[in-house]
C-alpha cells in the first residue's frame, strides 16, 4: 500500500511539474570525478502509448548562432570523459557559441532519479543518457522532445568555418546506424522517435577455449546443445558448475524473444509472461540447476565471471554468459607472464540458430523540451555530432568496451587495426566487439512503458525462485510463482 501511495504521489508531482516545465531555468550540475558505474538492470524498449508527448513540430529552420549553454548528464568515468571532452572541443570549432556543460551523475539509475526530480520543477538538463524505460517515466510529464521533425529538418546551418550542414540527418547517416540500435528510439507506441543510440552492449557466451580444445568440445549454438555440453563437462569435472549466467532477467526475456512467446506489451494488458511455454522453459532450467549445470549471479552471490576465471583448486565454470562490455573481467589473471587459459567468445545459444535473438543494451541519448527552441536546436546539433561522428565512436568503443552503433566504424583505420588484434588474451575486448559486430541483425528490444522495469525485476526474481524452491508438485509451484509475479507487477506499477 505504501508503494501505491508513493507511486500516486510521484505521478501527481510529475503532472504538476509539466505545468511549470517551460518557465524555469535549465538545471546545471558540477562535474564530478566519480568512476563510471553500471546499471543494476539494463532495460530495453519497444513501445508505449503512455509515453506520448504533444511537443510542437519544429519547422524547417535551424540554429541561428545564439549563445546557449547545453547541460548534458551521463555516467562516464574519467577515461570516457577524456574522449568526450576532446570531441566537445572539435564541436566548438564548428559552433563556438554552444557551451557544453557535462556532468557524471553516478550510474544509470542515478541519472534517471535525478532527472525525474528535476522535471518536477522544470530544471531538467538538455541532453541525457537514457534507457527506454527512463524515457517512459520522463514522458509521464511529456518532457522528452520527439526527434522526428529534427531528423527530417532540411534547413542549412552555417558553421564557424564557413561550411554548412543540414540540420537533420541525411539518408546516408540514417543508413549507417545499425538498425536494431536506431529503431530502439522509435518503439514507444506513438510512432515518434525519442532517442538516438550512443554506445551499446549485448550478452555473449565466454568459454574456456583451452579446456574445450583439450577435450574436443564445441561451443553450443542452441540450448539443446548447451544441455548436452553441460552434461559432458560435468562428467569431465564433477565438481564444476559448467555454466554461469549473470542476468536472470535477461535470460527470461531472451528466452521469450527466441521462443516468440509473450513477455510484456506496451498497450492493453502489460504483463503477459504467464504462459505454458514460458513455464516450461523455466522448469527445464530448474532441472539444469538441480543437476549442477548452471548458476546465476544472484544464486552464486557474485558475478559468475568469478567462477569462470577461478584458479586451480577452486570450484569453477567453463562457460559464462555476461555483458560484452565486461570482457576483461572474463579473462584470468596472468601467471608467470601468461594467461592460464585462452578465452573464446561466441553468440549465446539460441532456440533456433537460424533466427538468432540477442538483447540490445547500453545508453542512448534524449533531448528535453525547453521554452527557448534555440536550446533544442543546439542540443540536437550536439547529439547529431556525437552519434554520427565515426572517429568519436571508434575512440569511445576502444576506451569503453561498448560496441559502436555505426556500421562504418568497422572500416575506420584505427578501429580496424584495434580489431585486428582480437584474441582471447590481451585483445579480448576487441574479440568481444568483433562478435557483437558479426551479429548486428540479431538484436532485439523489449516494450518500454511505465512499469516495464518492474516486469524486468520480477521475471529475474521468478527465475531465482523457481530454480531453488522446494516442491512436491513442481508444475503447481511454478504456476503459483508465475501468477504471483504477474500480480506483483500490477501492484508495483
Q: What do the PLM-derived regions correspond to, one by one?
A:
Residues 90-176, 210, 214-218, 309-311, ...:
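Extracytoplasmic "Venus flytrap"/periplasmic binding protein-like
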Residues 55-62, 133-202, 342-349:
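Hinge/lid segment of periplasmic solute-binding proteins
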Residues 66-77, 98-103, 127, 243:
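Short, well-ordered beta-strand elements
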Residues 59, 77-99:
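Short, polar/charged alpha-helical segment
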Residues 93, 99-101, 121, 191-192, ...:
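Extracytoplasmic/periplasmic substrate-recognition and gating elements
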Residues 359, 423-487:
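C-terminal capping/gating helix-and-loop segments adjacent to ligand/active sites or protein-protein/ligand interfaces
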Residues 64, 83, 152, 325-334, ...:
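Mature extracytoplasmic/periplasmic domains
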Residues 229-232, 269-299, 348:
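Glycine-centered hinge/linker elements that transmit conformational signals in sensory
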